[in-house]
């Protein structure tokens, strides 16, 4: 299969590296010529250019690894060059704000979005080889127009990339769940780090708990600002629910309520253990 990857950042670079090693013919485009040159020099891609039109007519699949707001702009500019049965997909972390419009803009090509649940704190193609997909989730978000054949092609893409669990779900359920499992987690990490009044002194006392909780606080501010705003209704609901649970813990502390604290801790332990069982299976 011939693929064009639009955007050679961390994820785009990781896709290029893995797919080329799986026998795909991989082309890439990026506004940064240095990223293209790096990918060519390290055999991540067969060829690359700063102009998507150099490859777009000749590939079977176009993978958009660009910011949410840039996706529709790209489609408006290049969809007239798409061909029938060509698959257009994206790796974006939110879906419902643009996928339906993207589906219409992409015709006569076939648009089907997906979301690789993986990444690193660092950004850029230079770090993409370190991006691990093994054991991670790969979410496909078909619409009513998406055929079974298209979903299966994306399933194979996820398998070839090395993902462990591949799930199909609608765009609205995706955004609801991602608002909790990904965006709320990032919001908590950011808030925890920013609540520190004396960060220079804190480093003397950091252990595994703080490191584990705050790893994702090193965040791409431009990308994540877009992701949060595109999914703000879901995220605000999750933040409110989290605050309610944190308040319950706070009030138990204020009232010396050991019984409630123990109940909260037991509940979280049981839920987390059940999650681990499902992950192992």
PLM regions: where:
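Rossmann-like NAD(P)(H) cofactor-binding subdomain of soluble oxidoreductases
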Residues: 74-126
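Short beta->alpha hinge that forms the Motif I/post-I loop of the SAM-binding pocket
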Residues: 31, 66, 91
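NAD(P)+-binding Rossmann beta1-loop-alpha1 motif at the extreme N-terminus of oxidoreductases
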Residues: 1-52, 56
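Interdomain hinge/lid region at the active-site interface
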Residues: 201-271
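Rossmann-like NAD(P)-binding element
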Residues: 53-82, 86-87
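Internal alpha-helical scaffold of NAD(P)-dependent oxidoreductase catalytic cores
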Residues: 130-215
């Amino acid at each position: 299969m011939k693929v064009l990857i639009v955007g050679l950042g961390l994820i785009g670079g990781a896709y290029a590296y893995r797919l080329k090693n799986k026998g795909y013919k991989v082309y890439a485009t990026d506004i940064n010529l240095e990223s293209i040159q790096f990918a060519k020099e390290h055999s991540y891609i067969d060829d690359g250019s700063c102009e998507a039109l150099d490859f777009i007519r000749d590939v079977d699949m176009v993978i958009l690894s660009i910011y949410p707001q840039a996706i529709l702009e790209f489609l408006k500019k290049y969809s007239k060059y798409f061909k029938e049965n060509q698959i257009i997909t994206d790796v974006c972390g939110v879906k419902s704000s643009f996928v339906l419009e993207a589906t219409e803009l992409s015709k006569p090509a076939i648009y089907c979005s997906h979301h690789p649940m993986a990444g690193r704190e660092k950004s850029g193609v230079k770090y993409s080889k370190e991006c691990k997909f093994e054991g991670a989730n790969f979410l496909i978000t078909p619409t009513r127009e998406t055929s079974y054949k298209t979903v299966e092609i994306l399933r194979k893409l996820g398998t070839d990339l090395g993902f462990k669990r591949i799930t199909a779900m609608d765009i609205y359920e995706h955004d609801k769940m991602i608002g909790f499992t990904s965006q709320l987690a990032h919001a908590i990490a950011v808030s925890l780090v920013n609540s520190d009044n004396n960060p220079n002194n804190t480093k003397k006392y950091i252990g595994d708990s703080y490191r584990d909780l705050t790893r994702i606080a090193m965040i791409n501010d431009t990308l994540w600002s877009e992701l949060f705003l595109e999914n703000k209704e879901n995220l605000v609901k999750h933040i409110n629910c989290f605050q309610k649970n944190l308040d319950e813990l706070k009030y138990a502390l204020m009232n010396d309520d050991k019984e409630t604290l123990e109940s909260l801790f037991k509940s979280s332990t049981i839920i987390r253990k059940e999650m681990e069982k499902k992950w192992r299976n």
